């Protein structure tokens, strides 16, 4: 009985991982589907059109970082359906941004 307990503890200690891998998950800024394109835009006209929309200059880590990237160039962070010729059709706020 004592041998079983000691053997089980020893086996449990050996089975424990020595190093844990850091897990990274993709950042979800814009919902999948239609509004999947993150853009920085000057003006959001009632969620229908975003004027002077450009792609972020770097890959955002999260929603606040996305907002900061766009704010550096004087624009607003938005998710768009179809960015064409610096205009984006159907825009909304990214997930996690309140203003």
UniProtKB/Swiss-Prot annotation:
Where does it localize?
Secreted, Cell wall; Secreted
| Signal sequence extent | 1-15
Q: Which Gene3D superfamilies does the entry mention?
A: Hydrophobin (3.20.120.10)
Which InterPro entries does this entry report, sorted A to Z?
Cerato-ulmin_hydrophobin (IPR010636), Hydrophobin_sf (IPR036686)
**Would the keyword ATP-binding be found if you checked this record's keyword annotation?**
no
GO annotations of cellular component type: extracellular region
The record's section on Pfam families has:
Hydrophobin_2 (PF06766)
Where is this protein chiefly located? secreted
Which factors induce or repress this protein, as stated in its UniProt record? Shows the highest expression in the down of developed fruiting body (DFU) and low expression in the other stages of fruiting body development.
**CDD domains hit by this protein:** hydrophobin_II
Per the UniProt entry, the disulfide pairs are: 30-79, 40-70
Query: Which key words tag this protein in UniProt?
Result: Cell wall, Conidiation, Disulfide bond, Secreted, Signal, Sporulation
- According to its UniProt entry, what is the function of this protein? Aerial growth, conidiation, and dispersal of filamentous fungi in the environment rely upon a capability of their secreting small amphipathic proteins called hydrophobins (HPBs) with low sequence identity. Class I can self-assemble into an outermost layer of rodlet bundles on aerial cell surfaces, conferring cellular hydrophobicity that supports fungal growth, development and dispersal; whereas Class II form highly ordered films at water-air interfaces through intermolecular interactions but contribute nothing to the rodlet structure.
Membership in a protein family: Belongs to the cerato-ulmin hydrophobin family.
Quaternary structure note: Homotetramer. Further self-assembles to form highly ordered films at water-air interfaces through intermolecular interactions.
The protein here is known as Class II hydrophobin 2
Q: Which gene encodes it?
A: HYD2
